[in-house]
Amino acid sequence: MIRMGFFLTLTVAVLLTSLTCSEAVPTDKREMERLFDRILLKDQRQCPYCVVHCCPPSYCQASGCRPP
């Protein structure tokens, strides 16, 4: 189960790195929140966007994400 979660997180991170930041991150805050909710588990401490440096640092902190 843990391996599956790790693999899924890794896959999402790799997919996001293949996109440009402008494509990966919506500018509208509500869209961005919906996207976060869809791809993230609530108990994760890092979000893929922060890991690939694609979301604004202020949004990362507000959403509870911790940059690496």
From Swiss-Prot:
Provide the free-text tissue specificity comment from this protein's UniProt record. Answer: Expressed by the venom duct.
Cite the entry's keywords alphabetically: Disulfide bond, Pyrrolidone carboxylic acid, Secreted, Signal, Toxin
Q: Which residues form the propeptide?
A: 25-45
Disulphides: C47-C55, C50-C60, C54-C65
- Any one Gene Ontology molecular-function term assigned to this protein's record: toxin activity
Q: Where in the cell is it found?
A: Secreted
Signal sequence coordinates = 1-24
Q: Name one GO cellular component term.
A: extracellular region
Pyrrolidone carboxylic acid occurs at Q46
What role is this protein assigned?
A: Probable toxin.
Q: What is known of its domains?
A: The cysteine framework is VI/VII (C-C-CC-C-C). Displays a mini-granulin fold, a structure composed of two short, stacked beta-hairpins connected by two parallel disulfide bonds. This newly described fold is derived from the same cysteine connectivity as knottins (ICK fold). The name 'mini-granulin fold' comes from the structural homology with the N-terminal region of the human granulin.
**Membership in a protein family:** Belongs to the conotoxin U superfamily.
**Protein name, UniProt field:** Conotoxin Am6.8
Task: Say which species the protein is native to.
Answer: Conus amadis (Amadis cone)
